[in-house]
């Protein structure tokens, strides 16, 4: 990402699979085929034991993006304010996008990048729940929580001796947002519910069904709707104009449904013309309002916990005084007292990243720059899908954190977009206006631009190596799972990307520092994200990621028994690729084929390190010592200060270098409180960074920093699992983490004391052999699929 939205302003001024593939991974917004199964014996984690973020006051609506608590089911999401008198939900649907296929180039060779051509993610509506008499002056003992253990937002408070409680969540099985108001001690709820449009939609009330609704259609043809209903068997609920009113309700159940006619099928224009969103939303809201509130809650919690409980995190004990602090104060105290570790806070931060993944990526579109959570209809960079770090960083966490079921959203998105990406590549990539066009004149396969939308559209400049970086993410999921069916599904993406590079690479004569020369293959004119220059040959970023792409294609073809001749061609190309050198002048790994110290030394991107992390073909075992030292030198020059996502990437790289102190310090930099719009973590734990007089929310650091934490605890690549490679001193006394994913098809439970591994449980989820390491200890192990092995390194 750029360091400010000025790029968007500038752009405003400057102005292989078969079509029709239906995707199993994305649920369209249609009538549910059967009743949802209601689980029995569900046990919520008690508040006193739950991992939670908590606050002594409601969110201020003017700061909802920094203070509102997020809920989501992968498609529907909301930011929740939890004001007893005036609660508000900023509601979103992941498929609600303006914009088009955007398949034209401007005179400067860029794709248009505005809200009407490229498009933007936006709000579906606001839902407001106003309760009479529950004003700030009347309320006591207020507390709101984001309950990470159970997957819901709660608010509790007292009014005139009665104790009130509010639960808000987005259910994945029932596909609705639920707000449930309860009380103990003789209290009642009276007030009104409003559905507030964020554009020019009109809200209508329907007395016969006791619903309020809105519907509209964008210029791109996307139809959408939202419906709210409420039920109480202890009071009165009615429609008054375009509002719902409720009177003397001891308990009140509010159900919100909404959706669009988006369909992940390029052949059908990404629209399901047979669906009427308003009808589906109304029917669903009414059906769910007939279900008991406890049953809805139990169904949601059982589903959520089936993912959340895949990993437990214990990094050590915090003090009682730390636990007594609300979450925002706790962030501040940790920052101002760097010598006083708060391991439970850091464990909660990791679990918050997992919560965002569970709630943001479930058989849906993948997580964009802001996930499901917005506060207006003008998100920075349109909350798009950026292909030069952001969407990839969003998915680093999944398999490492026991959330492999959340990953397919990314793969299915790429598959759904592939027909359009291929078509636009064939038609527009070698256009004379594209400064990155192939000088070979050849074109094949597919690639992307730096920005992508949900409708097959591309934005900003072409990004030649964006295809390879997406494939790296897709391949990494395979390395964790060894799922052959998944590999077969993504194979067209791998092959098409490799075909693109087979057509693009050019041959040059390169002179090495010792005076020797060699004919090598290099990337044509390109741009090292987002550093420049725009017309460089053989940028390290592309050379490394294409080398990995070619390896992936060969392994996939061999596994699936396909394309033997093409795989052999790719192997030949891979062997002739130029690979980055360490500069004899600076000692750094070069970003370009140039030994001088050029560029912005503290640039936010680590593009030349993509082969070190998230890639792994540069590593301690196979890379020359000089290369590892060149990586270290480059990281030192890049520094320890940047935006959240950039610090997260740095942290993961330092963990790979086994430098626990610097990896941990960068984590603390990400977690510093964002005060006065500075870079850091906001009250609701969203990552923010400064832009002028405001702070921008960008979600990638919320996944990248937890990934770095897990990299401190476990490093893996196929054939190697290393325990505690970079354990910070703050966590060293004692800890235990269960469910860490390891490449090669394994899961690991890890326990330690005084900085040493006390036990490790290794489970095969598809792998059969690997080497285990802990310090100087080594052990080669073989397991059957499903088998478990416990080791105690000595």
Which residue stretches match the model-derived regions?
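N-terminal export signals
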Residues: 3, 9-31
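Aromatic-residue-lined binding/catalytic grooves and analogous aromatic/hydrophobic interfacial grooves
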Residues: 36-458, 476-478, 495, 543, ...
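Non-catalytic carbohydrate-binding regions of carbohydrate-active enzymes
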Residues: 475-481, 485-486, 497-507, 567-600, ...
């Amino acid at each position: 990402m750029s360091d400010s939205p000025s790029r968007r302003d500038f752009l405003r001024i400057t102005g292989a699979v078969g079509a029709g593939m239906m995707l199993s991974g994305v649920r369209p917004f249609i009538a549910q085929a059967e009743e949802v199964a209601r689980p029995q014996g569900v046990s919520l984690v008690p508040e006193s034991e739950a991992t939670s973020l908590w606050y002594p006051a409601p969110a201020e609506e003017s700061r909802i993006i920094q203070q509102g608590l997020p809920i989501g089911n992968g498609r529907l999401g909301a930011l929740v304010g939890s004001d007893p008198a005036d609660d508000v939900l900023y509601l979103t649907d992941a498929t609600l996008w303006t914009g088009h296929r955007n398949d034209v180039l401007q005179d400067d060779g860029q794709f248009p990048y505005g809200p009407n051509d490229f498009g933007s993610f936006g709000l579906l509506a606001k839902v407001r729940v106003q309760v009479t008499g529950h004003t700030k002056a009347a309320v006591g003992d207020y507390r709101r929580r984001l309950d990470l253990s159970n997957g819901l937002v709660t608010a509790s408070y007292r009014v005139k001796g009665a104790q009130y409680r509010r639960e808000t969540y987005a259910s994945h099985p029932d596909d609705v947002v639920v707000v449930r108001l309860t009380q103990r001690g003789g209290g009642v709820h009276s007030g009104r519910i409003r559905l507030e449009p964020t554009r020019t939609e009109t809200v209508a009330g329907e007395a016969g069904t006791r619903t309020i609704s809105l519907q509209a259609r964008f210029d791109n043809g996307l139809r959408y709707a939202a419906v709210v209903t409420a039920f109480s068997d202890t009071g009165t609920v009615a429609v008054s104009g375009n509002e719902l009113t409720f009177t003397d309700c001891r308990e009140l159940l509010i159900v919100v449904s909404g959706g669009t006619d988006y369909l992940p099928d390029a052949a059908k224009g990404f629209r399901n013309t047979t669906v009427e969103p308003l009808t589906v939303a109304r029917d669903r809201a009414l059906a769910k309002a007939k279900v008991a509130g406890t049953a809805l809650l139990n169904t949601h919690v059982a589903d959520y916990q089936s993912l959340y409980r895949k990993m437990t995190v214990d990094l050590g004990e915090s003090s009682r005084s730390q636990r007594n602090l609300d979450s925002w104060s706790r962030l501040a105290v940790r920052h101002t007292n760097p010598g006083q570790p708060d391991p439970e806070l850091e464990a909660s931060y990791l679990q918050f990243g997992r919560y965002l993944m569970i709630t943001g990526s479930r058989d849906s579109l993948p997580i964009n720059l802001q996930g499901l959570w917005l506060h207006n209809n003008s998100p920075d960079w349109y909350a798009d899908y950026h292909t030069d770090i952001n969407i990839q960083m969003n998915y680093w966490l999944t398999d490492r954190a026991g959330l492999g079921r959340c990953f397919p959203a990314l793969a299915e998105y790429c598959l759904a977009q592939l027909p359009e990406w291929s078509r636009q590549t064939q038609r527009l990539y070698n256009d004379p206006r594209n400064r990155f066009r192939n000088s070979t004149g050849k074109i094949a396969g597919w690639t992307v631009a730096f920005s992508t939308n949900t409708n097959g559209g591309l934005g900003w400049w072409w990004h030649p190596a964006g295809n390879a970086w997406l494939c790296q993410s897709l391949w990494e999921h395979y390395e964790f799972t060894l799922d052959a069916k998944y590999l077969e599904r993504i194979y067209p993406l791998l092959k098409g990307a490799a075909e693109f590079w087979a057509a693009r690479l050019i041959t040059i004569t390169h002179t090495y520092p010792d005076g020797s020369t060699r004919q090598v293959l290099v990337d044509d004119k390109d741009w090292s994200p987002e550093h420049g220059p725009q017309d460089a040959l053989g940028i390290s970023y592309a050379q490394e990621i294409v080398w990995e792409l070619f390896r992936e294609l060969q392994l996939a073809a061999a596994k699936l028994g396909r394309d033997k001749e093409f795989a052999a061609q790719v192997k030949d190309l891979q062997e002739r690729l130029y690979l980055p050198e360490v500069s004899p002048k600076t000692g750094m790994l070069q970003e370009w084929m140039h030994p001088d110290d050029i560029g912005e030394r503290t640039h936010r991107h680590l593009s030349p390190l993509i082969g070190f992390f998230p890639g792994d073909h540069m590593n301690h075992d196979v890379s020359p010592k000089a290369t590892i030292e060149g990586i270290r030198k480059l990281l030192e020059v890049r520094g320890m200060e940047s935006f959240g996502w950039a610090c997260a990437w740095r942290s993961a790289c330092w963990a790979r270098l086994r430098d626990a102190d610097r990896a941990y310090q960068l984590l603390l930099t990400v977690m510093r409180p964002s005060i006065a719009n500075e870079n850091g973590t906001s009250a609701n734990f969203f990552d923010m960074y400064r832009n002028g007089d405001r702070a921008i929310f960008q979600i990638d650091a919320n996944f990248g920093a937890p990934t770095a934490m897990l990299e401190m605890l476990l490093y893996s690549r196929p054939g190697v699992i290393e325990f505690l490679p970079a354990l910070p001193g703050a966590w060293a006394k004692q800890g235990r983490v269960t469910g860490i994913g390891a490449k090669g098809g394994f899961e690991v439970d890890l326990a330690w004391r005084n900085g040493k591994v006390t036990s490790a449980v290794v489970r095969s989820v598809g792998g059969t052999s690997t080497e285990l390491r802990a310090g100087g200890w080594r052990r080669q192990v073989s397991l059957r699929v499903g088998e478990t092995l416990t080791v105690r390194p000595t």
